[in-house]
């Protein structure tokens, strides 16, 4: 019920303006404090930085609530960093297990890829040489046009376009031809690689059913062990957070109770 009251109070009070809030050094009415608190909270979210938190804690409301937001923020950050650090070894353990169990398959696939790579290397080198040669010829043919561009006027734009269009189209068609030639040369090796991969997967499926079951059991066991190791770490992190959450909740409820008594 108190959560609902707090929510309604925040919804109704967010439209008010806390004028001269930072100059308030005298005790305020609970309603004013809650209104100012909401305004400062919105400004803090907007600023999203420690400067806003420090400014809030230096205000009248901040001093009275004494939330120690900056200290709590640093503490929570340290707790999160510790949790991440504690989790790292277990993540590494699972990763190493996975790499070890798939080492044989990865080695075979790498070997097949290297074989195909060596077969297609001449075609790639040939394509690269032709592509470079075509671009150089294109550059040389454009050199005179580039000189004319220095003195280009509106009257010469159409003439310049007429000169450039056939050159660009010819270069485009020739480059497309080289790409198509490369595609045709690589197609058989692409099919070969696809067939080898399919064959490896089929062999694993046919021969590796017992191994797959064993591996599945091993993964389940590792995940179970990981969960057991992670549980106390997460619980420790939760326990670190609880005091700050309870402290914040208690102070807000106290302020709201005082407000309800005042307006009653």
UniProtKB/Swiss-Prot annotation:
Broad class of the protein's primary localization: secreted
UniProt cross-references to Pfam families, sorted A to Z: Apolipoprotein
Coiled coil (UniProt feature): none
Example GO biological process: acylglycerol homeostasis
Tissues with expression: Major protein of plasma HDL, also found in chylomicrons.
Intrachain S-S bonds: none
Residues covered by region (10 X approximate tandem repeats): 67-264
GO CC terms: chylomicron; extracellular vesicle; high-density lipoprotein particle; low-density lipoprotein particle; very-low-density lipoprotein particle
Subcellular location: Secreted
Domain of life: Eukaryota
Name the record gives this protein: Apolipoprotein A-I
């Amino acid at each position: 019920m108190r959560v609902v009251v707090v929510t309604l109070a925040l919804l109704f009070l967010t439209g008010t303006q806390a004028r001269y809030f930072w100059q308030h050094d005298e005790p305020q009415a609970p309603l004013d404090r809650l209104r100012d608190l909401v305004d400062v909270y919105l400004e803090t979210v907007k600023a999203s930085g420690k400067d806003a938190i420090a400014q809030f804690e230096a205000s009248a409301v901040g001093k009275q609530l004494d939330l120690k937001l900056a200290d709590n923020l640093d503490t929570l950050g340290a707790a999160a960093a510790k949790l991440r650090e504690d989790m790292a070894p277990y993540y590494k353990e699972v990763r190493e297990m996975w790499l070890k169990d798939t080492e044989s398959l990865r080695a075979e696939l790498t070997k097949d890829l290297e074989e195909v790579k060596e077969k297609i290397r001449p075609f790639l080198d040939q394509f690269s040489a032709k592509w470079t040669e075509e671009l150089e010829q294109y550059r040389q043919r454009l050199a005179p046009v580039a000189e004319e561009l220095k003195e280009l006027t509106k009257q010469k734009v159409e003439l310049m376009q007429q000169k450039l269009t056939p050159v660009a189209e010819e270069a485009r068609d020739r480059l497309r031809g080289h790409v198509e030639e490369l595609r045709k040369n690589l197609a058989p090796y692409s099919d070969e690689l696809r067939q080898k991969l399919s064959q490896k997967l089929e062999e694993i499926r046919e021969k590796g059913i017992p191994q797959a079951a064993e591996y599945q059991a091993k993964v389940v066991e590792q995940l179970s062990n990981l969960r057991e190791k992670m549980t106390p770490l997460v619980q420790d992190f939760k326990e670190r957070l609880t005091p700050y959450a309870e402290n914040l909740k208690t102070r807000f409820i106290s302020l709201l109770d005082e407000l309800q008594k005042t307006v009653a």
